[in-house]
Amino acid sequence: MIPCRAVLTFTRCLIRRKIVTLDSLEDSKLCRCLTTMDLIALGVGSTLGAGVYVLAGEVAKADSGPSIVVSFLIAALASVMAGLCYAEFGARVPKTGSAYLYTYVTVGELWAFITGWNLILSYVIGTSSVARAWSGTFDELLNKQIGQFFKTYFKMNYTGLAEYPDFFAVCLVLLLAGLLSFGVKESAWVNKFFTAINILVLLFVMVAGFVKGNVANWKISEEFLKNISASAREPPSENGTSIYGAGGFMPYGFTGTLAGAATCFYAFVGFDCIATTGEEVRNPQKAIPIGIVTSLLVCFMAYFGVSAALTLMMPYYLLDEKSPLPVAFEYVGWGPAKYVVAAGSLCALSTSLLGSMFPLPRILFAMARDGLLFRFLARVSKRQSPVAATMTAGVISAVMAFLFDLKALVDMMSIGTLMAYSLVAACVLILRYQPGLCYEQPKYTPEKDILESCTNATSKSESQVTMLQGQGFSLRTLFNPSALPTRQSASLVSFLVGFLAFLIAGLSILTTYGVQAIARLEAWSLALLALFLVLCAAVILTIWRQPQNQQKVAFMVPFLPFLPAFSILVNIYLMVQLSADTWVRFSIWMVLGFLIYFAYGIRHSLEGNPRDEEEDEDVCPDNVNAAAEEKSAMQANDHHQRNLSLPFILHEKTSEC
């Protein structure tokens, strides 16, 4: 029988949180050289990929019609909710790691590893698939001569593998890995160059669309669509309308517009790469929130403008789903414009490839530095770039692009991204209701005065909540809480956030797989629906009643807890829509990850071992001993509260390499 002490120790290992210290925030082995404009270009380039040249036509024809502009608006609002949560964490914890780090400092090590492991999968598949798409687009410009050559001499007839090995994609990935290894500043310049060309091409598309467009294409009558369907000998839909809908601005109704918004949501994925630059940007507390919000705004304007121009130039039912813009320009008599579109598409793929490749080594670097992955991945070059993680990421992505058919794996990207979005939103909720405490003491400054001021700063709030610390949960403390957050209220919020995620998952499953029963007004489905809705509302209102921490940072999510809760709802609902095969593949990937974590990561985690940083060797032994004594004293007095809390950054970093 396993002793209870061993079980308790093992459980504590799984939920231990990363302690972020002042000295670790100030110090970084990476080069602080990126500006706010670099972050905006990185976010726009990563998010505004080749999908802008394809997605609008596909969604407009099948789901939304001209109301695709509304679909993009809804999708943008849902994405901004996730973006705001990332922005607050970027302001609070400006360290490399993105959602992995945010989860680590808030809900513990196991969830952090799951998040980081899923992000690795998402970025690897994203990099490999974009590299193959770049290769395929370039091959199209050469009349598919490259593909025909490799199909003739290197054809592969194996299940799960690609039709032929893509040598061009391999060279592309390795070239990009070399560029990123050389330095982040040089990579940023390349990204800004291609992003600028992409934006110029999209501006050309918008202007051309509004010049050659016809508002009548947004007002097509239902009778006209029926005549077209009849002439093409196409059967009508179930409700007697044309297969192209009922015409007008919303030919498929508002449900079609919402369905289009669910697809368009993925068009805004990519801004999270900005959050991985925390140790490479000047003044990250301001630059990261501005970069995330501005890049999402620019991307929305681009998607909105291109989709409006496209549906004005050409009736939505005639749009080509694979190459909508070239066909639309042919339709209005501007055939040569397709070459401009091709150039923009290649530039968009280039920035999207860099946007997928850029955050991958930084996630590997952050996890390796914390001891959860192999330590060699945390090596940094003389140019202050995570060279080992970058080259490892490049080799893995190149092998994937070289051999595998990635179409079946692309949906797995969505799980990792949506799970990260959900966890970051949940972490914001948990974080904002924690008691505010000072940082863990820096190790090598004469800190006694700072420690005393830290104690004085928290003594007032501690004295005000002393009476509540020992009390158990009660209806009075539940609905009439104290004015300041306590450990009790923080624990309550943490439990309620987990319960809310469970309720939202149940609600999403019911509305996805029981929608027919709800439509038939079956009693069991209506009862379950009402139960989920009432409980969700009660949980959110209870969280809203709890006291928030009053300390301020450069950016904070507004409308708590409603905005993060809605973000969790959107993300979990979209996760439920994924196929069973995708979840099976995801489970296999997670089994592999757990093998690595329980065999290596849990034993080598820095949070469970003494910190052996290189710079400690240069510190005076007397200062180290004094700092160690002060740190151990503080841990003895306040260990549990420090683990529950998270530091709040109140200063700016402008250091540069």
From Swiss-Prot:
Residues 1-38, 88-104, 185-192, 270-289, 361-385, 431-489, 545-554, 603-657 are cytoplasmic. It holds the Pfam family AA_permease_C. It is found in: Cell membrane. The modification Phosphoserine is found at S24, S463, S645. One of its GO terms (biological process) is establishment of localization in cell. Functions as a permease involved in the transport of the cationic amino acids (L-arginine, L-lysine, L-ornithine and L-homoarginine). The affinity for its substrates differs between isoforms created by alternative splicing. May play a role in classical or alternative activation of macrophages via its role in arginine transport. NCBIfam families: 2A0303. This is Cationic amino acid transporter 2. It comes from Rattus norvegicus. The gene is Slc7a2.
